[in-house]
Amino acid sequence: MQVIARGIRGWIGLLGLLLALGLTSTSAWAARSGEFVTPHTRYWIDPQGQATIDEVLRLPPDALQAMERPRSFEIDRGALWLRYEVPALDAARRWSLVLEGGAFTNRATLYAPGVGGAWQVQDAGDHLPVAQWTHPARMPVFTLDGAAGTAVWLRLENHPAPLSPSLRLQDAQDLQMSRDRSQLWLGVYLGFGLLVLFLGWVHVRLYGDRVFIAYVAYVTCMLGFQIAFTGLGGLFFWPTLPRWNDAAPALFMLWLTAAGIWFVREVSALSRHSRLLYRFATAWSLFGFLFP
């Protein structure tokens, strides 16, 4: 019987050790840099977009729903509130919450508990000049300083496009590496585009052909769209122009489409095949340039 008892105690001890290791590894995994933490949030939609952080805190617990998986929200002129509990973080590293794909989110505000009960507020979004963001970047970045279990609140606005929030937890080193990597590849892409633009302009000067003029316009609009869409424009080229930063991706897309129709019209010599199609392509191209 003593042998059996010792065996049972041994198994219990082993199970306890495995449980402790499992909890430790789970905690470490929860704080791993680079992890997408959107499924760990809970959300509430404010239909009017007027609720303050204090009013949100007074909501009943069942008003918040678990995110569980990536979702898209049609909130019109309302606001989406996300509640995220800070996991156990390595205090030796600085941590940030990154709103990926948020280069053209209208407004993103993070509320974190501060000293004396006051809220520490961090602002971003293309309705605010990038130069006035708490942490100017291509996309909204928020610092996390709270202890494990601290609840932070992220308020998001976006009209008229839907919201598809994607939150990533990153330490300072990973954040800087991802910035450097993305800017390197964007620089390579834009550098190649500028080379193509230069060669197109050389052909315009050499031949004076309208095909090359249309091609130069198309490449220019394409580069402008990429600069605006990726957030490089707001960060480097127009950091104090929020209205332009908000409208630029849509405008450049319209102009890109119009320039593409113009280029196809010229390169295919459409006037030789159908005067009706030629006039239609001309009107459609002009509409794209003048509609904004």
Residue ranges and their predicted role:
Residues 29-182:
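Soluble non-transmembrane domains of integral membrane proteins
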Residues 22-25, 58, 237:
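Short, flexible coil/linker elements and helix-boundary hinge sites characteristic
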Residues 12-24:
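Bacterial N-terminal signal peptides
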Residues 2-15:
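Bacterial N-terminal signal peptides that target proteins for export
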Residues 26-28, 286:
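Compositionally biased regions
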Residues 10, 94-98, 141, 156, ...:
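Flexible inter-domain connectors and hinge/loop segments
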Residues 188-292:
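Juxtamembrane segments at transmembrane-helix boundaries
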